[in-house]
Amino acid sequence: MRKLFFEDSLKLELNVIGYQNQGESIVFFIKTDGIAAYTGLVDCYKTEEQNAVKMVLEKEQVEKIDFVCWTHPHDDHTLGLEEIWEQYCTNDTCFCCTDIIQADLDLYSEEAKLLFQNIRGIHTSSKRKKMRIMYLKDSTQAERLLCVGNTKKYEFRIQSFAPNSAILGERLIGSRDQQGNAYSIGLFLFLGQYSIMLAGDVENQTIRRIADGDIEYPVDYIKIPHHGSKSASFLPDKMRGLNLLAPDIAAATLFRIHSLPEEQVLAKYDNWGCGEIYLTGNMEKGKDTVGYGIVKTTFDILEQNEYDIETELIGDAVVHQKEMAG
């Protein structure tokens, strides 16, 4: 098992990135003594003018990415991923995706198709760089390593809870509506005492079927699924049904043309008792300033600071203001 060594500090940093109109990326780091010792990426997006993913990677002087998860092939989770593949993925990179059936490929963009061609040809072409490809579904362990120091060991794991295997099986003979989101991967990150739920674009049909055993307690952070849409609104109900306390933090990215996130969905997280809800931009378009927003949250695994979880809002990112009753 791979080991990361530290002396004085061990932190998990999570950057949820969104743009003015659409797009979602998550860059996370395990930092040992202030240095990014492990880098992960969940989805990618860029505009013609801006690439906040590369900005974050370059700031941390990242030369290679250890873990990539492409949750599903919609463009707002895909654009720029080919560039990441070429520049940052190596033989040691674990690249995770969902196993799209051939009949569905024509539903997606040319960039998505090109990525699938690269993935499927990676072990047959001598010209393509080699890396570890994993097709994720529910209850699949994607990564496991140890952070070692100060006479203690802290396990880091990445575990998928979606897509649901039964739903994917049904799709072979069932409805072909909303193809992409049924394939969406959902992940848990675990490090030390912290549990982080990255819910991709997982929607209600999948949320209802998440196995109780796939949810490890407590959940400290949720990336709200599908940009806070009604079609993915059941997650707080699912968690409350398991008598789970609300997380300290929930975060959502924007999909402005569809007016996402929806206020009534965010209200469900408020009513559940979330400590704070952050958005990567303001739904009032005139208030945007730089075109992207980053919700940067740092978890102090050694609990050395006054606050073990700290969040910094970068660019257009904002705190969601709860609507007052009456």
Report each predicted region and the residues it spans.
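Core dinuclear metal-dependent hydrolase active-site scaffold
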Residues: M1-K64, K130-Y221, G293-G326
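C-terminal regions of proteins
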Residues: P236-R240, L244-L245, T253-G326
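Active-site neighborhood of divalent metal-dependent phosphoester/pyrophosphate hydrolases
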Residues: F67-T78, D92-R120, A251-F255
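Metal-dependent catalytic neighborhoods of phosphoester/phosphodiester hydrolases
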Residues: T78-T90, L105-L115, F234-K238, E263-Q264
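Active-site-proximal beta-strand/loop segments in catalytic clefts of secreted hydrolases
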Residues: I17, V42-Y45, W70-P73, T98-I100, ...
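Active-site environment of divalent metal-dependent phosphoester hydrolases
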Residues: Q22, E48, P73-L79, Q102-D104, ...
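Active-site metal-binding motif and surrounding structural segment of the metallo-beta-lactamase
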Residues: A37-Y38, T47-C97, D212-K230, N243-D248
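Short, aromatic/basic amphipathic alpha-helical patches
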Residues: V53-V56, L107-S126, P261-G273
